[in-house]
Amino acid sequence: LQNVLGKWPAAPGLEPAAALILAVHLEAVAKLPTGELIGFHGQTLSHDPQNFRTHQLGDGSELARQAGVAVAWDFRSEDVARGGQGAPLAPIYHWALARYKQMQEPVAIVNLGGVGNLTWVDARLPPERGLLAFDTGPANAPLNDFMLKTTGQAYDADGALAASGRVDTQVVATFLQQPYFSRPAPKSLDRDSFGDMAGLVAQLSAADSAATLTAICVAAVVAGLPLMPVQPKQMWISGGGRKNCEMMRQLAVNLPMKVVDIDDIGLDGDMLEAQAFAYLAARVARGLPTSFPATTATKAPLCGGRLSLP
């Protein structure tokens, strides 16, 4: 898949990667209990919403045919075609989760994956008025890249290396001067929007580098606080970042609200994204909106995605 990143549909050499994506999804379907509907995200190879185009590799119609199950897929194209960013798409699921937890006040849900995403939810309101979403900035991606290059480890286990170092506050402050952080929400990034961030910490020790890259993730979340319509009393953390003890410690120290590992309230922080696309699939099947002006900057609520029958 690394060899086809950045390619658009007409590019040569996509067939082996498409076949691999189909095969692994068919394998997963075979291992799971039989369902009535599959939400199939595909693999994003290229994303250029400024020019109204996005490309997720994977043929949902072929998956439906071979799996014998209806498939909702191609969730982003319609949003991008109508002037939206095509991301993030999980916020409507976050709204449903807040309703499920019977929240009677606004809450922020932050997913710390390669990039950080924040959804502000007021579940007392309909999604057209009770949602705001944006990408906060880099999260695990630069730290993981640094760890792999420097130590051979895929990530900073428990945040141990970062916890042993000192944050270079000047590096953090300089990074936050980038124009992205002064833009209004909604706004989105991809994993490589800020380029190779290793150069920011090239003069620091390994421990100080890890501490500083962790602090950048936290500072980006803090920088997003003024964008929320009402400051929530809780922030639920999902994604791999919640397993980084130092990252969670820094969030708790620097945020004015209670920071909660989403697992601690009975939700599954590892499966949230997969669950979100199952939920999106159900909405597509019913013709319900999957994105909104305050989540992707689309001009009106719309139902993205295609539905393919077996």
Language-model regions, residue ranges each:
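Short beta-strand-loop/turn "lid" adjacent to the catalytic site in phosphate-handling enzymes
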Residues: 8-60
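Phosphate-binding/catalytic loop of phosphoryl-transfer enzymes
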Residues: 49-54, 65, 69-153, 303
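Short glycine-rich, Thr/Ser-proximal phosphate-binding strand/loop in the N-terminal lobe
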Residues: 1-12, 128-131
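Glycine-rich phosphate-binding/hydrolytic loop that grips phosphoryl groups
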Residues: 215, 263-310
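Short helix-loop-beta connector
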Residues: 34, 103-105, 229-233
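Conserved ATP-utilizing enzyme core subdomain
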Residues: 126-218, 296, 300-310
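Glycine-rich phosphate-binding loops at beta-strand->alpha-helix junctions
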Residues: 232-252
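Phosphate/ATP-binding catalytic cores across multiple sugar-kinase/actin-like superfamilies
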Residues: 24-32, 206-231
